[in-house]
Amino acid sequence: MQRQRTAYHAAAMANRTLQMTDALVDYVHRFGVREHPVLAALRDETMKLPEHGMQIGPDQGAFMSLLVQVSGAKRILEIGTFTGYSSTAMALALPAEGRMVCCDVSREWTDVARRAWSDAGVDDRIDLRIGPATETLETLEADSFDLAFIDADKPSYDAYYEGCLRVVRPGGLILVDNVLWSGEVADPAVENERVSTIRALNEKIAADERVDHVILPIGDGLTMARVRPA
């Protein structure tokens, strides 16, 4: 009986994601990431800003960098650049001929990003578009990107997702950040515009026959969706 209980407990634990304590997060950052010096300096600089919570962590940056490499992406679209951690991480993983289009509404934040791009030697690969991303999306050619990353204002997430479905080629990837929103998406007692918008998009993608997808419990939750061929 004890063996049965032990086996059941082990099976249950195997199907669950670990609770990430601060100590475990630190362990992952120490041994699971090789953070580029420019990224480390940028992370430290951004932590001094009141909005530092908008920055992705080094583990997510490393994952996205590796994803660029294994997917062979050469054209990347980023919606929501902030101070440039994610764009720098992905641009460093691009081949020499690779290019990125980054969309943001803030010159103040993206001035920090520009310095990081220059320090990392990737500024020639990045085309920064200042203005509403919905308008920028309308100017981009269909099927012209291999990968898109959405990490901007949550009320516009659905519009960004639909726009990315148009501009990302079949077989390409769409990444959506903050899809778990500190766990609040799973708490029925929490009702606000941001959480409701994220829940609605999560449910939409789960039922969307245009993509294959998975929600990864990395950072604040990351959806990875592959655009199915028509």
Where are the language model's segments positioned?
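S-adenosylmethionine/decaboxylated-SAM
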Residues: 54, 58-230
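A glycine-/small-polar-enriched, mobile loop at the entrance of the PLP active site in fold-type I
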Residues: 26-31, 48-54
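Beta-strand-loop-alpha "switch" segments that mediate conformational coupling across diverse proteins
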Residues: 42
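N-terminal auxiliary segments of SAM/dcSAM-dependent transferases
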Residues: 2-39
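Alpha-helical structural elements of signaling/regulatory helical domains
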Residues: 33-37, 52, 210
